[in-house]
Regions:
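Short, charged/polar micro-motifs that form catalytic or ligand-binding hotspots
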Residues: 68, 87, 91, 183-187
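Class I SAM-dependent methyltransferase Rossmann-like catalytic core
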Residues: 45-85, 154-162, 167
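A generic local structural motif
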Residues: 75-78, 95-97, 167-173, 192-196, ...
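S-adenosyl-L-methionine
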Residues: 122-177
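Membrane-proximal basic amphipathic "stem/tether" segments
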Residues: 1-66
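SAM cofactor-binding core of SAM-dependent methyltransferases
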Residues: 72-146
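C-terminal substrate-binding/active-site "lid" region of AdoMet-derived donor-dependent transferases
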Residues: 173-177, 182, 187-251
């Protein structure tokens, strides 16, 4: 595994930002400002986003704010979609979005590659009431040298996971019969996950593809043959705009 100085610097900057925002959140909790924002975050996107900035990489904070980690425009589209049907949901990449979806759907299956994060999410799911059945699965990556590869699309392109194979993870959606109304792609090996997801999408269903402005993801989305609605803009807990895309079958 190579050590890219740019990736190292990026991770350090992100860690520094997270630590700073958590320090600010701790300080605000000692004042009336945090309570003031908390009472107003339901009044509009601006208040909600300001409140969420203190919940960066904080699953409990995002659960309390009742948001997934997508752009607000995408959240609105998916929320409206879930109100139209008792949706069967599959998710790549568990987190606050798992509970958000479980509050609005008939069933949620979520696959996670990281054992520690899986345990944290499972604890939160088990502590919830008024959610649908959630099937949380662990599918860790394999070392690429130990797996016969038919397609490099299953190899992680993330710097700190280079050389790991996510075939089992991406294929988890194929272990159950039937199709899914909503498929969320917000984890590892997203191009491979999209390939599997496109074959399991219900008629009239949608795929949520997060962080879709990244070049390698744009290419995979373009080649998927699906209709694309790009939703750029503010994202809960992020200080900069991002993009989430909604993919649907052509009608």
């Amino acid at each position: 595994m190579t050590n890219d100085p740019r990736a190292t610097l990026s991770r350090a900057a992100k860690s520094g930002y997270v630590a700073t925002m958590r320090g600010i959140a701790w300080g605000l909790n000692k004042t009336s400002v945090a309570d003031w924002l908390s009472r107003r975050h339901h009044r509009g996107r601006g208040y909600h986003w300001a409140s969420s900035l203190m919940a960066i990489h904080d699953i409990d904070g995002l659960i309390a704010l009742d948001v997934p980690w997508w752009t607000y425009d995408a959240i609105e589209v998916v929320d409206a979609f879930l109100k139209t049907r008792p949706a069967r949901v599959f998710e790549y990449g568990a987190g606050a979005s798992t509970i958000w979806a479980a509050r609005r759907s008939a069933s949620v299956t979520s696959v996670e590659h990281d054992a520690d994060w899986y345990a944290r999410v499972l604890e939160r799911v088990q502590g919830q009431t008024n959610i649908c059945p959630v099937d949380l699965r662990l599918a860790p990556a394999s070392n690429a040298k130990d797996v016969a590869l038919s397609d490099p699309i299953y190899l992680s392109q993330k710097q700190d996971m280079r050389g790991l194979n996510f075939t089992s993870y991406a294929s988890e959606i194929d272990k159950a019969d039937g199709s899914y109304d909503l498929i969320i792609i917000d984890g590892r090996a997203r191009q491979a996950c999209l390939r599997h997801a496109a074959n399991r999408l219900s008629p009239g269903g949608m795929i949520v593809f997060d962080n879709s402005k990244r070049a390698r993801y744009r290419e995979a989305i373009s080649e998927s043959g699906l209709s694309v609605k790009r939703c750029p803009g503010l994202t809960p807990s992020l200080p900069y705009p991002d993009e989430t895309s909604i993919l649907t079958a052509h009608t």
